[in-house]
């Protein structure tokens, strides 16, 4: 297959915990990409991501699931100890990192609590559900805050992001290990359809040539999955009888 610059990477979670983690990862990325808050547009993107992140964190015990996964990844690494030729120093380093992340996560306050208690975040969060509800006459506090010196705003935003560090660091490590647990292999779909067993996997990763102008519609769970390729142009698009793509089951 061509180089990565000419392909699109799609990811699909095969269980609810991975679905939640990918959503949290996406929201954390939005926060870090828009943390400068130089105008109202970037500010609303930032605060909307915070509001959605808090909503996700309130739906389940994210900390417990992450701690379980950190322990599971440690046990998986331990199994590699018996494999001849394995880099034991690398194994020990990763296990030590996982233990440190678990300790930090265990000692951290309730996920998102620092953000929930912030007055400005609370005010903006209340108005985000109203279409156009963050105008200057609705939120004069935010309007005034955005005209504060940049260094003052950066200091406050830095504190917000720092409060999420235990969550972000643990999640980044877990998702990195999950993603690297699968190897991309070439596959062929017939008339736009492909299915296979998932072997108790957590995540599907699919690479597809941009030139095909197709996207995958994926359904599945931890034991089996199905992929149907559909054209971006639903009226004039073409699905080749045999389509080559790359798939990693992680």
Curated annotation (Swiss-Prot):
Q: Does the keyword Transmembrane apply?
A: no
Its main subcellular localisation, reduced to a broad class, is cytoplasm
Return one Gene Ontology term, BP aspect: division septum assembly
Looking up InterPro entries in the UniProt record yields: ZapD, ZapD_C, ZapD_sf
Q: Which family does it belong to?
A: Belongs to the ZapD family.
Q: Which NCBIfam families match?
A: PRK05287.1-1, PRK05287.1-3
What does the annotation say about its assembly with partners? Interacts with FtsZ.
Per its record, how is this protein called by name? Cell division protein ZapD
């Amino acid at each position: 297959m061509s180089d990565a610059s000419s392909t699109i990477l799609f990811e699909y979670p095969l269980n609810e915990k991975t679905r939640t983690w990918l959503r949290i990862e996406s929201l954390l990325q939005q926060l870090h990409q828009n943390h400068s808050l130089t105008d109202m547009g970037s500010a609303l993107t930032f605060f909307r991501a915070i509001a959605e992140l808090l909503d996700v964190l309130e739906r389940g015990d994210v900390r417990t699931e992450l701690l379980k996964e950190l322990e599971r990844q440690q046990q998986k690494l331990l199994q590699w100890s018996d494999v001849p030729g394995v880099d034991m120093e690398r194994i020990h380093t990763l296990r030590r990192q996982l233990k440190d992340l678990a300790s930090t996560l265990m000692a951290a306050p309730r996920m998102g609590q620092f953000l929930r208690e912030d007055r400005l975040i609370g005010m903006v969060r209340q108005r985000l559900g109203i279409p156009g509800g963050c105008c200057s006459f609705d939120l004069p506090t935010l309007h005034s805050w955005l005209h504060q010196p940049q260094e003052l705003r950066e200091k406050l935003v830095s504190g917000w992001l720092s409060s999420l560090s235990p969550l972000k660091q643990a999640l980044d490590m877990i998702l990195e290990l999950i993603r690297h647990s699968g190897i991309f292999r070439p596959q062929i779909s017939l008339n736009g359809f492909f299915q296979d067993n998932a072997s108790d996997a957590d995540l599907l990763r699919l690479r597809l040539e941009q030139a095909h102008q197709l996207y995958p519609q994926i359904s599945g769970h931890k034991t089996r999955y199905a992929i149907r390729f559909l054209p971006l142009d639903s009226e004039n698009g073409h699905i080749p009888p045999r389509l080559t793509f790359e798939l990693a089951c992680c």
